[in-house]
Regions:
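Functional-site microenvironments in short loops/helix caps that host divalent-cation chemistry
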Residues: 4-5, 11, 16, 86-99, ...
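A short glycine-rich, aromatic-capped structural motif
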Residues: 1-86, 96-120
């Protein structure tokens, strides 16, 4: 599921001296608006659902599916034996809940757009606005943009309050979700720091020394008991 990340202002970039003298990540103050982010990484099962959908809709265009497949050769490294991971990591049921790897930026962006359409399609189907079409093809599969353009006719059995007088849902009705996307570099670093709760007037004034929210050596959270770096 998605978790809300409260926005704020923080110092982005390296805050310690660069031992290699690269200085390619100089600290600067950045303001991040509130946003939502997945609580966990996209799993192999999530991405396999995407591949399965592409295989069904683009069954006559195997190159579309091929271009979406992750690069499993990323597991190969010199002086190591990772052939089992190359061969089974993505598809074996044992790794279904593991994060998908070997996905390029373009592939991840395409997945995010696909996910946006599938989520909004399910919302409309659950609300009775649309009936699910099991026979979608490359020429008639659902997209949010095509629906908002008026290319779909809503059902007469839609739930009260979900549609306008023309039985259509608009973005301003608050039912459809905005498009999923990859986080920006600032959003990713801000979320990874986990500094919510350490703000003063929307400003992050201190970074965490330890994984827990305090400068003490011990934490009351059982997950961190025994953790000491």
């Amino acid at each position: 599921g998605l978790v809300a990340i409260e926005g704020g202002t923080f110092t982005m970039g390296a805050t310690m001296e660069s031992v290699h003298y690269e200085w390619n990540n100089n600290p600067r103050k950045v303001t991040v608006s509130s946003f939502y982010m997945d609580q966990t990484e996209v799993s192999n099962l999530d991405y396999l659902e995407y591949i399965n959908w592409l295989s069904r809709v683009y069954k006559d265009y195997p190159e579309v599916v091929k271009n979406a497949l992750p690069d499993t050769l990323v597991w190969r490294k010199s002086l190591s034996y990772n052939e089992p991971m190359v061969e089974i990591y993505f598809r074996h049921p044992s790794y279904r809940d593991y994060p998908v790897v070997g996905v390029s930026w373009r592939q991840a962006n395409d997945y995010a757009l696909w996910r946006s359409d599938r989520v909004n399609e399910k919302i409309l189907v659950d609300a009775g606005v649309l009936s699910y079409n099991n026979n979608q093809t490359k020429d008639n599969f659902f997209t949010t943009d095509s629906y908002l353009s008026g290319l779909y006719k809503s059902n007469a059995t839609a739930q009260a309050g979900t549609t306008d007088v023309n039985n259509n849902v608009k973005m301003e009705d608050g039912i459809l979700l905005p498009k999923y996307r990859l986080p920006t570099e600032a959003e990713w670093e801000y979320a990874a720091l986990g500094l919510i709760g350490n703000t003063e007037s929307e400003n992050i004034v201190e970074r965490k020394v330890y994984p827990w929210n305090s400068n003490g050596l011990r934490s009351n959270q059982p997950d961190y008991m025994g953790t000491m770096v």
